[in-house]
């Protein structure tokens, strides 16, 4: 199964989702992380890292790994508009890469100047989203960071210690403004 937190987006027709019981939700995620680290399957340890990212998101922290939406993944809404992800909000920015109904050849959209402009906007996107569709590809791409965390915390779990939920920002060359709402809004 996959875990998620509330996100606001045009696609969800929501822009007012708020977690009112943050402490309770984060405590539940912390318990889930402890259970996942006790598993014998490495995939569970990486899910624990992902869930730590959800805690970070709920607490309003800076996105731990960069977002590469529009390069690693995309989203097509029901009317054919192609976006880098489904978590865009008008209050920050929202620009489509193209429309699959108007331009039936997807590669024409994907390789277009407009798509590149959107990717440039993603590089500076202030949202700190942490959704499986955008977090998983960068967890694979920059695997040394989640791997180091997973191994260290699996060892802690085996010693009967709690996970270290450091929630640090991993600098992998991304724009320092990306994923940090605190700097702009």
Regions found by a protein language model. Give the residues of each.
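Flexible mid-to-C-terminal extensions adjoining Fe-S/redox cofactors in radical SAM and related proteins
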Residues: 81-82, 86-185
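Radical SAM enzyme [4Fe-4S]-AdoMet core and its adjacent flexible, acidic
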Residues: 1-69, 73, 77-78, 82-83, ...
């Amino acid at each position: 199964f996959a875990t998620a937190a509330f996100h606001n987006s045009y696609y969800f027709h929501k822009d007012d989702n708020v977690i009112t019981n943050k402490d309770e939700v984060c405590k539940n995620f912390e318990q889930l992380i402890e259970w996942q680290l006790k598993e014998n399957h490495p995939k569970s340890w990486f899910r624990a890292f992902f869930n730590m990212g959800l805690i970070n998101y709920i607490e309003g922290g800076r996105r731990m790994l960069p977002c590469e939406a529009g390069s690693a993944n995309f989203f097509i809404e029901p009317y054919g508009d192609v976006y880098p992800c489904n978590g865009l909000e008008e209050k920050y920015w929202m620009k489509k890469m193209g429309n699959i109904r108007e331009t039936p050849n997807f590669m024409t959209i994907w390789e277009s100047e407009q798509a590149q402009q959107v990717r440039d906007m993603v590089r500076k996107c202030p949202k700190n989203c942490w959704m499986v569709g955008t977090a998983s590809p960068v967890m694979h791409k920059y695997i040394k960071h989640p791997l180091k965390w997973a191994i260290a915390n699996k060892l802690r779990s085996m010693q009967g210690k709690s996970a270290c939920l450091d929630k640090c920002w991993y600098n992998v060359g991304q724009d320092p403004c990306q994923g940090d709402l605190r700097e702009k809004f």
